Amino acid sequence: MGEDRIGFRVVGTVRSVKGHCNAGHKVGDQVELSGHNTGNMCGFFYHDLFPYVIMLQFGGGFPPEWGNPDVVEMSCMDKMNEVTIELKRMRDNE
């Protein structure tokens, strides 16, 4: 696969962990994600994040009532050990 990035950079930052994440994610962890880069995320969590990562990577946005069109916060499906991550589209100056 090529080295050239396609679209915008998308960075995920772990905002909270309730319980113990079996994949080892910790508050403050940052990962770069894309359609071709899972960033070593838990596979189950990445599966849920994928549509949002792709939308941010290729210029889509969220409705105004959600706040910032470049940012979304998501939580994993393990509600006993819930990890919350903020996905952010990085503009050229970030």
Regions found by a protein language model. Name each.
Residues 43-60:
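Short, compositionally biased
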Residues 1-12:
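Short, basic/aromatic beta-hairpin or loop at an interaction surface
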